[in-house]
């Protein structure tokens, strides 16, 4: 019988379902990271609008913050409390400026 090639993996070998789970979790992680990055970008744009003091851009930014936070909850990326906290802080920042 031919000698077996040494495995590159350390530890027990994974079953096909476990390998698939690793692959899908990595895909989901990339998707979530991308979406969280989008959320942070929108929050930064909103913060710049608040600093500029332009009422129209503040209200548009606040709408986009609310929308993206709700989408994050719908997709399971944020919990409801986290989204509520993000929206609350954004509205606090918008009120003195508006």
From Swiss-Prot:
Gene Ontology molecular functions: small ribosomal subunit rRNA binding; structural constituent of ribosome
Positions of disulphide bridges: none
Highest taxon of the lineage: Bacteria
Basic residues composition-biased segments: 1-12
Entry GO CC: cytosol; small ribosomal subunit
InterPro entries: Ribosomal_bS20 (IPR002583), Ribosomal_bS20_sf (IPR036510)
Keyword terms of this UniProt record: Ribonucleoprotein, Ribosomal protein, RNA-binding, rRNA-binding
Keyword Cytoplasm belongs to the record: no
GO biological process, one term: translation
Keyword Hydrolase: no
A family per Pfam: Ribosomal_S20p
Chain positions covered by the region annotation Disordered: 1-31
Task of the protein: Binds directly to 16S ribosomal RNA.
Family: Belongs to the bacterial ribosomal protein bS20 family.
HAMAP family: Ribosomal_bS20
Stored PANTHER family: 30S RIBOSOMAL PROTEIN S20 (PTHR33398), SMALL RIBOSOMAL SUBUNIT PROTEIN BS20C (PTHR33398:SF1)
Protein name: Small ribosomal subunit protein bS20
Record organism: Chlamydia trachomatis serovar L2 (strain ATCC VR-902B / DSM 19102 / 434/Bu)
């Amino acid at each position: 019988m031919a000698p077996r090639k040494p495995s590159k993996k350390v530890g027990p070998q994974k079953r096909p379902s476990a390998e698939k789970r690793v692959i899908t979790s990595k895909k989901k992680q990339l998707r979530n990271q991308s979406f969280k990055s989008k959320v942070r970008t929108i929050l930064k744009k909103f913060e710049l609008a608040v600093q500029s003091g332009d009422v129209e851009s503040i209200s548009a930014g606040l709408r986009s913050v609310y929308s993206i936070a709700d989408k994050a909850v719908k997709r399971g990326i944020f919990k409801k409390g986290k989204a509520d906290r993000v929206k609350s802080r954004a509205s606090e920042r918008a009120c003195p400026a508006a």
